From Swiss-Prot:
Organism: Acetivibrio thermocellus (strain ATCC 27405 / DSM 1237 / JCM 9322 / NBRC 103400 / NCIMB 10682 / NRRL B-4536 / VPI 7372) (Clostridium thermocellum)
Name this protein carries in UniProt: Heat-inducible transcription repressor HrcA
Keywords, comma-separated and alphabetical: Repressor, Stress response, Transcription, Transcription regulation
Entry-linked InterPro entries: GAF-like_dom_sf, HrcA, HrcA_C, WH-like_DNA-bd_sf, WH_DNA-bd_sf, WHTH_transcript_rep_HrcA_IDD
GO biological process: negative regulation of DNA-templated transcription
Pfam family, one: HrcA
Function: Negative regulator of class I heat shock genes (grpE-dnaK-dnaJ and groELS operons). Prevents heat-shock induction of these operons.
PANTHER family (alphabetical): HEAT-INDUCIBLE TRANSCRIPTION REPRESSOR HRCA
GO molecular function annotation: DNA binding
Family the entry assigns: Belongs to the HrcA family.
Xref: HAMAP family: HrcA
Length: 351
């Protein structure tokens, strides 16, 4: 059913009040706090209509109304005013990105911390599945006599290393030679393309350095296994306990239990936002997972070039300060791209 301007203004006033107070909103409150030019009785009648239309609900213990998921959805899509970040909040996000960082996962963790502090909700972030990650470089670096460090770098900026044991007779120049061979054969391949024929080609090229083939190969394999594990970051879950929606011990326990399931969080982020460059808002029952039916999730992807590198999201109660979260996500997204491209380069073809 169509909402006329009067109903829209009343619905916006109720939701704005409820977001800030967490208390059911009555007609007298709306009449007193908002200059709508309407009597309390008129507002009461309009609120009854909005409830009948599914935009508001009435808790059993209160004469006031609270927004339904449908009400929040209409608010977010059509009524919500834009917010601006404070200079302090902008500085917080910029500082998180400007810290000396040489790996994408470090950047993501720093940004997650900043977003959680600014929004006062929980932030979640994930790097994508790595089967299609392209190997950018392999280095074998001498550490001490009898030990070397295998370092694998992917096109998405992920860096993993593995300490290996080697013969004490192996010279540094041998390790440079081995690094060159591994780079020649592996650079530009996806993780899924590294197979036995490729390994045999490396073996044929090793020549006098055959004795360190297996240790280095084991080190590369170990790095790939580390890369292949999805990386998920969660910050500020404890923030949720500050909201009355989570004052119930059982409700809080269910939510915190959900937040430690990293595989589940990774799936939530992947399912919530598969479209590049879009910001997606899921409200209450729009979420598939039962423990999130009373939460809202706002997610976006971040990219380098035209490649989606990962997803970041904010989760809070449905009584979320949506405009504030969207302002933070929009600013973060605008700055994230340049920092991601600095870390991993604009050419993500792996060639």
């Amino acid at each position: 059913m169509f909402l006329d301007e009067r109903k829209k203004r009343i619905l916006q006033s109720i939701i704005d009040d409820y977001i800030s107070t967490a208390e059911p909103v009555g007609s007298r409150t709306v009449a007193r706090k908002h200059e709508l030019g309407l009597s309390s009785a008129t507002i009461r009648n309009e609120m009854a209509d909005l409830e009948e239309m599914g935009y508001l609900t009435q808790p059993h213990t209160s004469a006031g109304r609270i927004p339904s998921d449908k009400g929040y959805r209409f608010y977010v899509d059509q009524l919500m005013k834009q917010s601006e970040l404070t200079m302090e909040e902008i500085y917080s996000i910029k500082s998180a990105m400007d810290t000396k960082i040489n790996e994408l996962s470090q950047l993501l963790k720093q940004v997650s911390v900043a977003m959680s502090k600014i929004t006062k909700y929980a932030s979640m972030a994930a790097l994508p599945e790595k089967k299609n990650s392209v190997l950018k470089a392999v280095q074998v670096v001498p550490v001490e006599k009898g030990k070397a460090l295998v370092v694998v770098i992917t096109n998405s900026g992920t860096i993993k290393n593995s300490l290996i044991n080697i013969s004490e007779t192996v010279l540094p120049e041998h390790l440079v030679y081995v690094s060159n061979i591994f780079n020649e054969k592996l650079s530009g391949l996806t993780i899924g393309q590294i197979n036995m024929p490729v390994i045999r080609e490396i073996e044929l090229l090793m020549g006098p350095s055959q004795d360190i083939l297996m240790p280095v190969l084991n080190g590369v394999t170990d790095c790939i296994e580390q890369i292949d594990k999805s990386e998920v970051f969660l910050e500020g879950a404890i923030n949720m306990l500050n909201y009355p929606e989570f004052s119930n011990v059982e409700r809080a326990r269910e939510f915190l239990k959900l937040m430690v399931e990293k595989d589940l969080i990774s799936r939530v982020l992947k399912d919530a936002n598969s479209e590049k460059d879009k910001i997606v808002i899921k409200i209450g029952h729009e979420n598939d997972i039962e423990e999130m039916k009373e939460c809202s999730l706002i997610t976006t992807t971040y990219t380098a070039g035209d490649v989606v590198i990962g997803t970041i999201g904010i989760i809070g109660p449905t009584r979320m300060e949506y405009s504030k979260v969207l302002a933070a996500i929009n600013y973060m997204k605008s700055k994230m791209k340049e920092h991601v491209e600095r870390l991993i380069g604009k050419d993500l073809s792996g060639k």
